[in-house]
Amino acid sequence: MTVKKLYFIPAGRCMLDHSSVNSALTPGKLLNLPVWCYLLETEEGPILVDTGMPESAVNNEGLFNGTFVEGQILPKMTEEDRIVNILKRVGYEPDDLLYIISSHLHFDHAGGNGAFTNTPIIVQRTEYEAALHREEYMKECILPHLNYKIIEGDYEVVPGVQLLYTPGHSPGHQSLFIETEQSGSVLLTIDASYTKENFEDEVPFAGFDPELALSSIKRLKEVVKKEKPIIFFGHDIEQEKSCRVFPEYI
């Protein structure tokens, strides 16, 4: 079985210090990075990967003022970038979705999770537990009343949608390997690799455990060597220029 359609859906932008993309750089320059959600149309039903930024980020570039990342992260989010409004544009309500896949629970990937009170949210156990107590996680991203489906390690969501455990950027990050009807195999690294340079040249970037992150990149390289998928990175400005976005699909 394969995924009928894989949509790339823009979900706002985020100004991030360039030292977060390349740890060797001196902090002080901000990059304007894309924030993505991904919609998978499968035989079993629609699956959403990540939910963008929280409502508290709408028109609020100073969201992180007074925190340890003040001046290093500036969300650029409008009302249109709220996940419920994104879903309306693609023809769905929150309860229409089969699953939410949370690649990890950082603010720009799980900020909209609270809109899904019934839909199962698939997350790694190590990520869920880290988000309960580590300071880099916002409370909007680890709400207690949601329908979490806690997994451990690699996991097949439905035929053609495989989660790959890629910790390092965060304690329980997961990437996706997808078999699509139109384009063949696709690897979504998400934040296991922000950019092509992080992946191909193993340029270190921001994260929980740099050595573990490098191990995950090496693991994904083995997947690429064997399966030869199309690769999409988590926040690559250059790759963004050639991405086909909704309503186009791959």
UniProtKB/Swiss-Prot annotation:
One Gene Ontology term of the molecular function aspect: metal ion binding
Outcome when changing H109A: Reduces activity by 85%
EC number: 3.1.1.81
Recorded superkingdom: Bacteria
UniProt cofactor(s): Zn(2+)
Binding sites annotated in the UniProt record for Zn(2+) 1: H104, H106, H169, D191
Entry-linked InterPro entries: AHLLactAiiA, MBL_superfamily_lactonases, Metallo-B-lactamas, RibonucZ/Hydroxyglut_hydro
Effect in UniProt of substituting H106A: Abolishes activity
Catalysis: reaction(s): an N-acyl-L-homoserine lactone + H2O = an N-acyl-L-homoserine + H(+)
Protein name: N-acyl homoserine lactonase AiiA
Native source species: Bacillus thuringiensis subsp. kurstaki
